[in-house]
Protein backbone atom coordinates (compact mmCIF):
# COMPACT_ATOMS: atom_id res chain seq x y z
CA UNK A 1 0.00 0.00 0.00
CA UNK A 2 1.31 3.44 -0.91
CA UNK A 3 2.01 6.06 1.68
CA UNK A 4 1.14 9.60 0.77
CA UNK A 5 2.53 12.78 2.25
CA UNK A 6 0.59 15.87 3.25
CA UNK A 7 1.00 19.12 1.39
CA UNK A 8 3.60 20.94 3.49
CA UNK A 9 4.50 24.66 3.34
CA UNK A 10 7.52 24.12 1.09
CA UNK A 11 5.45 22.15 -1.44
CA UNK A 12 2.81 24.89 -1.34
CA UNK A 13 5.51 27.46 -2.04
CA UNK A 14 6.72 25.41 -5.03
CA UNK A 15 3.18 25.17 -6.39
CA UNK A 16 2.83 28.95 -6.10
CA UNK A 17 6.06 29.37 -8.06
CA UNK A 18 4.67 27.19 -10.84
CA UNK A 19 1.20 28.73 -11.28
CA UNK A 20 1.36 32.00 -9.36
CA UNK A 21 0.20 32.69 -5.82
CA UNK A 22 -3.36 33.66 -6.77
CA UNK A 23 -3.90 30.24 -8.39
CA UNK A 24 -3.16 28.15 -5.30
CA UNK A 25 -6.06 28.24 -2.89
CA UNK A 26 -6.03 27.04 0.70
CA UNK A 27 -8.88 29.06 2.24
CA UNK A 28 -11.63 26.74 3.44
CA UNK A 29 -14.28 28.90 1.79
CA UNK A 30 -12.60 28.50 -1.62
CA UNK A 31 -12.00 24.78 -1.03
CA UNK A 32 -15.65 24.00 -0.26
CA UNK A 33 -16.89 23.65 -3.87
CA UNK A 34 -13.98 21.27 -4.51
CA UNK A 35 -14.78 19.07 -1.49
CA UNK A 36 -17.57 17.25 -3.36
CA UNK A 37 -19.08 16.75 -6.78
CA UNK A 38 -22.81 16.54 -7.55
CA UNK A 39 -23.29 13.69 -5.07
CA UNK A 40 -24.76 15.02 -1.86
CA UNK A 41 -24.31 13.77 1.66
CA UNK A 42 -21.80 14.50 4.39
CA UNK A 43 -19.99 11.18 3.96
CA UNK A 44 -19.01 12.20 0.41
CA UNK A 45 -17.44 15.52 1.42
CA UNK A 46 -13.63 15.56 1.70
CA UNK A 47 -11.80 18.87 1.67
CA UNK A 48 -8.57 18.97 -0.32
CA UNK A 49 -5.53 20.57 1.28
CA UNK A 50 -5.41 23.02 -1.64
CA UNK A 51 -6.78 23.71 -5.09
CA UNK A 52 -4.24 24.42 -7.84
CA UNK A 53 -5.33 26.03 -11.12
CA UNK A 54 -2.75 25.64 -13.89
CA UNK A 55 -3.04 27.62 -17.13
CA UNK A 56 -1.41 25.16 -19.54
CA UNK A 57 0.05 21.70 -20.07
CA UNK A 58 3.57 22.82 -19.11
CA UNK A 59 2.34 23.91 -15.68
CA UNK A 60 0.45 20.63 -15.28
CA UNK A 61 3.65 18.72 -16.04
CA UNK A 62 5.62 20.68 -13.43
CA UNK A 63 2.86 20.23 -10.85
CA UNK A 64 2.76 16.47 -11.42
CA UNK A 65 6.56 16.19 -11.21
CA UNK A 66 6.44 17.96 -7.84
CA UNK A 67 3.60 15.77 -6.55
CA UNK A 68 5.31 12.58 -7.73
CA UNK A 69 8.64 13.57 -6.20
CA UNK A 70 7.00 14.34 -2.85
CA UNK A 71 4.35 11.57 -2.93
CA UNK A 72 1.48 14.05 -2.63
CA UNK A 73 -1.90 12.88 -3.95
CA UNK A 74 -3.33 14.84 -6.89
CA UNK A 75 -7.00 14.77 -7.83
CA UNK A 76 -7.62 16.03 -11.37
CA UNK A 77 -10.92 17.86 -11.70
CA UNK A 78 -12.98 19.23 -14.53
CA UNK A 79 -16.18 21.01 -13.61
CA UNK A 80 -17.05 18.61 -10.78
CA UNK A 81 -20.35 17.80 -12.46
CA UNK A 82 -20.07 14.03 -12.09
CA UNK A 83 -21.86 11.65 -9.75
CA UNK A 84 -19.00 9.23 -9.03
CA UNK A 85 -17.03 11.22 -6.42
CA UNK A 86 -14.02 10.83 -8.71
CA UNK A 87 -12.93 14.44 -8.25
CA UNK A 88 -12.87 14.35 -4.44
CA UNK A 89 -9.63 14.27 -2.42
CA UNK A 90 -10.28 11.13 -0.38
CA UNK A 91 -6.55 10.54 0.18
CA UNK A 92 -5.76 14.18 1.01
CA UNK A 93 -3.48 16.16 -1.25
CA UNK A 94 -4.70 18.77 -3.68
CA UNK A 95 -7.19 19.19 -6.47
CA UNK A 96 -5.74 20.09 -9.86
CA UNK A 97 -8.53 22.07 -11.50
CA UNK A 98 -8.59 22.42 -15.28
CA UNK A 99 -10.95 25.41 -15.29
CA UNK A 100 -8.31 27.89 -16.47
CA UNK A 101 -7.39 25.62 -19.37
CA UNK A 102 -10.42 26.61 -21.41
CA UNK A 103 -9.20 27.42 -24.91
CA UNK A 104 -10.11 25.93 -28.26
CA UNK A 105 -6.67 25.38 -29.78
CA UNK A 106 -7.56 24.26 -33.28
CA UNK A 107 -10.45 23.37 -35.54
CA UNK A 108 -9.25 21.31 -38.49
CA UNK A 109 -12.22 21.11 -40.85
CA UNK A 110 -10.38 18.99 -43.43
CA UNK A 111 -9.76 16.20 -40.93
CA UNK A 112 -12.85 16.98 -38.80
CA UNK A 113 -10.79 17.38 -35.63
CA UNK A 114 -11.17 19.90 -32.84
CA UNK A 115 -8.34 20.27 -30.33
CA UNK A 116 -9.42 21.79 -27.03
CA UNK A 117 -7.99 22.19 -23.56
CA UNK A 118 -9.61 20.12 -20.79
CA UNK A 119 -11.47 23.07 -19.25
CA UNK A 120 -13.62 23.81 -22.30
CA UNK A 121 -17.33 23.35 -21.57
CA UNK A 122 -18.93 20.45 -23.41
CA UNK A 123 -21.73 22.75 -24.61
CA UNK A 124 -19.14 25.02 -26.25
CA UNK A 125 -17.62 22.08 -28.14
CA UNK A 126 -21.09 21.08 -29.30
CA UNK A 127 -21.91 24.65 -30.40
CA UNK A 128 -18.63 25.07 -32.30
CA UNK A 129 -19.14 21.75 -34.07
CA UNK A 130 -22.67 22.76 -35.11
CA UNK A 131 -21.41 26.13 -36.39
CA UNK A 132 -19.01 24.24 -38.68
CA UNK A 133 -21.76 21.88 -39.86
CA UNK A 134 -20.70 18.93 -37.72
CA UNK A 135 -22.24 17.05 -34.84
CA UNK A 136 -20.54 16.41 -31.53
CA UNK A 137 -22.47 13.32 -30.40
CA UNK A 138 -21.18 13.20 -26.82
CA UNK A 139 -23.85 15.54 -25.47
CA UNK A 140 -24.54 14.71 -21.81
CA UNK A 141 -27.38 16.36 -19.94
CA UNK A 142 -24.73 18.26 -17.97
CA UNK A 143 -23.18 19.82 -21.09
CA UNK A 144 -23.72 23.37 -19.83
CA UNK A 145 -21.77 22.63 -16.66
CA UNK A 146 -19.38 19.82 -17.63
CA UNK A 147 -15.93 20.17 -19.13
CA UNK A 148 -14.78 18.14 -22.07
Label the model's feature ranges.
Residues 1-65, 69, 81-112, 141-148:
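N-terminal flexible segment immediately upstream of the FAD-binding catalytic core
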Residues 77:
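Conserved PLP cofactor-binding pocket of PLP-dependent enzymes
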Residues 61, 122-123:
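Short beta-strands and strand-coil junctions in structured, solvent-facing domains, enriched
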Residues 119:
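Extended, alpha-helix-rich binding/interface surfaces that flank or overlap catalytic cores
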Residues 123, 127-129:
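Phosphate/diphosphate-binding loops
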